[in-house]
Amino acid sequence: LSWVPSLGISFSFHLDGLALLFALLITGIGTLIFIYAGGYLAGHRDLGRIYVLLLLFMGSMLGVVLADNALLLFVFWELTSISSYLLIGFDHERPEARAAAFQALFITGSGGLAMLAGLVLLGQVGGTLELSALAVHGDAIRADALYLPILLLILAGAFTKSAQFPFHF
């Protein structure tokens, strides 16, 4: 489904064995978290809000693993940053929660910009933004002079999202 045709962005998804495995992990673990949160936060005035935020986070993660367009993947990637910010700052009345949420958003947002640059370069080198088509041209992409910068930019985004050294706090 064409989403932003002038930029070559399509609303496309791809389900293979690996994507299915991760989708099942996301929904399975997400369901367990829902059950736990319901018991742990029973009677909490904002229980409905935590459920909405957990659904947003889970849906964003599903979008990341199922997206077949690099820029669509980026949109879902950033939605995980936003939902993480909202979940970390769930107890927003506490200054510590607000500070931690902002710090997480700043770090993951900065890494997301690096990832976006890497994905745009990848699309330029590969001639498409469709991940399934890019996979076919892997050898040509690895042979390109921009391969190392592309790899480092995408890894920077992944490392900031997963709080890998030196992006952990």
Question: Which functions belong to the PLM regions below?
Answer:
Residues 1-169:
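...captures the hydrophobic TM-helix bundle architecture rather than a specific catalytic motif
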